Amino acid sequence: MGLLDGKVALITGGARGMGAAHVRLFLEEGARVVFGDVLDDEGKALAEETGAVYVRHDVTSAREWERAVALATDLYGKLDVLVNNAGILKYRRIHEMSPADFDQVIGVNLKGSWLGIKSVIDPMKAAGRGAVVNISSIEGFIGAEGLSAYSASKFGLRGITKSAARELARHKIRVNSVHPGAIDTAMVMNPDLVNEVDAETFVKSMVIKRFAKPVEVSHVVAFLASDRASYCTGSEFTVDGGLLTGAGY
């Protein structure tokens, strides 16, 4: 019996990287999965490979949220789980970053997740319960040079998580956040970021001295989506190899 048997899940940003790992693990654990992205070629390929259902989904669009949620409920009759995984990173120092770039990061990472929570309330109420997992970051706890917009969005997502947890508990909807650290994905390996960071020194500063595989985050996400996390809401789960334990000296 899988951890997520009988669950219907909607996962954003699911075409590659950590999102694709979530899609694969949720399927392995028995969930039926609809996943969205704006990367159509990769999304369609993953759907063909796994049997999950792909939908083009710009998370900044309320209309596209309505469409994605409707697809899941029309196909499977309910919606139990939302994983707000979609996110973008732009490495720019404050004096180099345009207002448009700042707005884009906040729009995808913060507003997109808020729209997602708003969009799933009614179907989760109808189902009698639900679970939302917001993918934040260790940058939701600390600042980093060149990541002002990204850090702001991830700090903000912590606040949305806690507010939503308080609002939605009466409907048996749990809301938690996951905070990955150094994960081996295309976004983390962004050339602008990699060129600014000495990877060897960075790894030496870790307690667990390696980058994580995306599926190592997915296992935490799946737990929070499952009934085994029935008493967890408004909580923050770090998957960071000990990066936030201290300064490393």
Model-derived regions: residue spans:
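Substrate-binding pocket helix/loop in short-chain dehydrogenase/reductase
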Residues: 93-94, 101-106, 202
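A glycine/serine/threonine-rich, flexible loop-to-helix segment
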Residues: 170, 182-205, 246-249
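Canonical Rossmann dinucleotide-binding motif of NAD(H)/NADP(H)-dependent dehydrogenases/reductases
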Residues: 3-34
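Active-site helix of classical SDR
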Residues: 117, 153, 161
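Alpha-helical segment proximal to the catalytic Tyr-Lys
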Residues: 122, 166-170, 230
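Short C-terminal tail/terminal secondary-structure segment
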Residues: 142, 222, 233-249
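Residue(s) in the substrate-gating loop at a strand-loop-helix junction
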Residues: 137
